[in-house]
Structure formats: structure tokens, C-alpha cells
């Protein structure tokens, strides 16, 4: 099962919510789920590193473990060159992904719901979605996951998503769970675990 963690790439939010992101990454690894992120910096990198650190401990015990999947966006829309080849460059890659999917899709942030955003792939690929603190881009991922009918937990501690509190988001997007602590997140993830 793939757990998509949708979070900000903003480094200042990563410093502020580092502990929260580490809890999420570590717990997903301990439960032996696969983790999907946008493969960028900020909280995406923190959650990915925590996942890999916990995964190493699991593998040291000769137990099976999940994989870290990174869905990368393009820096800009690829262009066809005269020689028939296309230009392509990743916008950001935190270097942690074990399975890396490079898209041609450049949009993010306020444009995160556009058809040229990799956020559609993130939302559709994940079986479950955990939302960490973030701005407009994280909010667009939440909205897409909700539109695609994914099970979602907001886990933001004292943070918010796009300036909205968890309660605001739960009212706006019916059926979303709010995780208040690690036990809430653990119980929610375990309730979806298939043996």
C-alpha cells in the first residue's frame, strides 16, 4: 500500500515542523508501507529521510520494508529541439527516492490543480494521503486527493494548510480525518493496512 505524504517544499516550514515530518516518515516505514512524496526539499525531504532511517533499522532485523517513491516535476515544459530530442530538467530532486518517476509536468503551487501539474499523479498513485503543513501547493494536493476519492488524514500539529486550520479543511472537504497525535495517525494507517 502506498501512503502519499503531501507537504511543503519550503525550508522555513521544514525547520518549524521537522519533528512532525519525522514522526510521519518513521511511522510509515515501521508499518512497512511504501512512501510517496514529490521528491523535493522542505518537509518532503525531512519525511523521506526519516522513512529511510527507519527502513534501515527494519532491514537490519531482516524484515521486509517499503520503498520511497519520488514523483518529480519538470523545471519547465519540455520543448522539442531541432534534432528531434526534447529538453528536460527536474525542478528539484532531494536525491532520496528509491523509485523515481520523472514527469514532464512543471506546474505547482497555485497552479497545482492544473492538468500540467504532477499533483494529479501524486494523488492518483497514493492509496492513502497524509497532509502535512504547507501552502497553496499542499492545499491543491489535498483538494485533488479529495476529488479523486482518496482517504485523507490532516496531520499538521500547530500548522495549517494554505492558511486554513484542520477544522476549516474538514468542513470544506467532508470525510477527511484530523490526526491530533502520533497515535491517531498510527491507528488510522493500521486501519487501512492489508496483511
Language-model features: locations:
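Short active-site oxyanion
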Residues: 32-35, 174-175
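Short acidic-hydrophobic, aromatic-tinged amphipathic segments that line or gate anion-handling sites
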Residues: 99-104, 172-188
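Acidic/glycine-enriched connector segments
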Residues: 20-31, 41-144, 148, 156, ...
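Generic N-terminal amphipathic, Lys/Arg-enriched alpha-helix
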Residues: 1-16, 24-31
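Nucleotide-sugar donor-binding patch of glycosyltransferase catalytic domains
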Residues: 152-178
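Residues at the starts of beta-strands that form the adenosine-phosphate
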Residues: 2, 34, 67-68, 151
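Short, hydrophobic alpha-helical segments
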Residues: 189-195
Amino acid at each position: 500500500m502506498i501512503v502519499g505524504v503531501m507537504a511543503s517544499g519550503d525550508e522555513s516550514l521544514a525547520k518549524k515542523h521537522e519533528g512532525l515530518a519525522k514522526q510521519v516518515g518513521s511511522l510509515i516505514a515501521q508499518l512497512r508501507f511504501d512512501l510517496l512524496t514529490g521528491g523535493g526539499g522542505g518537509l518532503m525531504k525531512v519525511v523521506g529521510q526519516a522513512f529511510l532511517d527507519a527502513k534501515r533499522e527494519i532491514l537490519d532485523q531482516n524484515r521486509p520494508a517499503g520503498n520511497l517513491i519520488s514523483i518529480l516535476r519538470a523545471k519547465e515544459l519540455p520543448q522539442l529541439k531541432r534534432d528531434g530530442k526534447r529538453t528536460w530538467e527536474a525542478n528539484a530532486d532531494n536525491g532520496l527516492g528509491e523509485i523515481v518517476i520523472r514527469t514532464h509536468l512543471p506546474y505547482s503551487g497555485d497552479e497545482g490543480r492544473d492538468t500540467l501539474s504532477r499533483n494529479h499523479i501524486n494523488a492518483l498513485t497514493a492509496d492513502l494521503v497524509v497532509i502535512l503543513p504547507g501552502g497553496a501547493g499542499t492545499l491543491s494536493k489535498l483538494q485533488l486527493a479529495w476529488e479523486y476519492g482518496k482517504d485523507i488524514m490532516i496531520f499538521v500539529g500547530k500548522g495549517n494548510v494554505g492558511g486554513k486550520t484542520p477544522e476549516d479543511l474538514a468542513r470544506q472537504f467532508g470525510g477527511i480525518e484530523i490526526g491530533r497525535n502520533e497515535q491517531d495517525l498510527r491507528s488510522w494507517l493500521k486501519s487501512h493496512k492489508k496483511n
